[in-house]
Amino acid sequence: NVTGGAFLEKITTNATIDLNSTTIGGQLNCTKATFEVEVDHAVNAQDAKINGGLIWREATVIKGTLSFANAHTSVLCDDESSWPSGGRVDLNGMTYDTIIGGPLDAKTRLAWLDKGSNWNGEFKPQPYTQLAKVLRAMGHDSDARQVLEKRDALLLKSYRKNLRKLSETTKNTTASHLATKSLAAAHWLFVDKLLGTLTGYGHQPFRSLRFLFLLIFLAAIPSHMAWTFGGFTPNSAVIQVSDDWKALSNTENAAEEWSSKTQAGRDWETFQAVAYATDLVIPIINIGQTDAWAPSTTRGAAGYHMWWLSWVFTIVGWIVTALGAAAITGVIRRD
């Protein structure tokens, strides 16, 4: 045990700094230190307890690895460039209470974690969870969510990697091999791409709103085209058998003519493409457009295609809305 601090500032060493299971009462200061250890740890601080804080700034690790596995420090004060790349850092299990004098943005911190969360080819999620916890406690909620999103993406990537390995071991059993490959493909499509893209694995729930707006825009285009080319009819059996509708039903754009200011349908719900698209895409909203108007498969190609597209937009809208609502609910519960 070290009752005071351990000051390694500006040292140059080719021997391992062994702090395994050491308790340091003060700081561990490695500012501007240079390490060049051929076949071992440059610093081995596994299970170390650093009560006064770890200062790791402007350090250079030419050769050797760093292990802070299961170490704890009250304060982390570092810069990203001092941590070596190439899988030479082990941060798994490392905990710290706060970050002072170091970067707090997600981009820089993710680059740091990328250096220290893979050890012997195996992904370790704990460094991401720890960083997110500290960032959230410090008030950096947005950066914390980005860190957790990246963690989950890498966890799923690791899961698929293990599935592929399992698939290789079951090549001699055709059914098991196909089942494993199918599971990996379905996992990639529905969990990774769908859930990740729409909600950031639940950590970016409001991202789904962008996709809803995009869906509304995409649905509004064929809706407008179908209306312009006479592909819509009133969504009412009573109106469709009425004499007023029958009198106009063979005109080029019967719906537009019937609902004009001088015709019987002038008081019917006015068609608006964006409102219709919103009604179509968002299932929890009822503006009244889809109740009033429906595309017809017998009134030209525009109406026919809109009839089919309405199913697509409705189903996709349900999926996006459901995932977004579930993600938002989850975030509210976590907060």
Outline where the language-model segments fall.
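Alpha-helical transmembrane segments and their helix-start/interface "positive-inside/aromatic belt" motifs
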Residues: 203-214
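Scaffold helices S1-S3 of the voltage-sensor/voltage-sensor-like domain
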Residues: 220-230
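Hydrophobic membrane-insertion alpha-helices, especially the h-region
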Residues: 213-221
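Alpha-helical transmembrane segments of polytopic integral membrane proteins
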Residues: 141, 219, 321-325
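Transmembrane alpha-helical segments in integral membrane proteins
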Residues: 312-334
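N-terminal leader/targeting and pre-domain segments
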Residues: 1-191
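Pore-loop/selectivity-filter region of tetrameric P-loop cation channels
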Residues: 187-205, 228-314, 323
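Hydrophobic, well-ordered secondary-structure elements that form the walls
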Residues: 144, 222, 328
